[in-house]
Amino acid sequence: MSITLSELPFIDLYVRLDQPDQALYRSKERGKSHINQLVPPEYQLAVDRFMSAVNEGLKENNDGSIDFEGVRCRLSKQKMSDNSSWVCARRINTVIPDMDKLGFAKHIADHMKALGKRDGLILVSGATGHGKTTTAVGLLAYFLRNYGGAAVTIEDPVEFMLKGRHGEGGHCFQVEVRQEEDWAVCLKRALRWAPRYIYVGEIRTPKAAEQLLRAATTGHLVITTVHAGSPEEALMGLIFLAEQAMGPGVQNILAAGLTGLIYQTMKETGPHIKYLFTEPDSPGDPIRSLIRENKIGMMSTYIDRIAARLANPSG
């Protein structure tokens, strides 16, 4: 039996599409994730089959997903300066993340798990490739398993197979946004299902940001991921996007709706977390006040205080 791509330990796979060329990959093996390596020659036939499948699947599109020989990938195609065409295939793990096995300090993981009892908005932020989606999905799966209720996810593409039963009382419905659809329309439609939890893979439009904030302040617990270089940047980016649809006053809505913010950096030893949360039923919470007063840049002080408080709850 010929070797398949499922045996290559890749996170990202780079394959030329217009003609055969040397493929490269970024390994998921510890200590090797920061370098690109040449795909070994014994995988060439598998790479050739993958190239054909991607060309057939994407056609004129630049983004999409593929199930290929036991591997599910998110695809992003680019035309290069020399007119060559390449695709980056991000491997999608079909195993649902377990919050107890993601490498978080126990006191932080336990507090994040408890957020599932609340409503509001949980932002999971960080740079590309630092595990935002894994953490967000791990939280949602934990909430469903332990607290029950219905969840609707809105993704492009679906990255983990969450659909179906979770524990005794949890059920997840997964929606993959079609290319011609708007994220805001899918989110608005999801609200009619009266879900306990909503997971939005990424906020891409002002209207979607508006719907997300509306959902977070009307009894749902909403989880989403945000590309950002810092916790403050994550909040300011969401405000900037939502203001284009909602106008002034977004800070007040975000302040009322924010439940938790996770900023994640993946290191060789595991995830490094900056974490903040608001107190329930506390309009005077200092985090909410900073957001309302547009003083988000001062939030780092509270992140440090929260870290110390969780690490030493009796101190």
Name each model-derived stretch:
Residues M1-G315:
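Short, flexible helix-loop junctions that flank or precede catalytic/ligand sites
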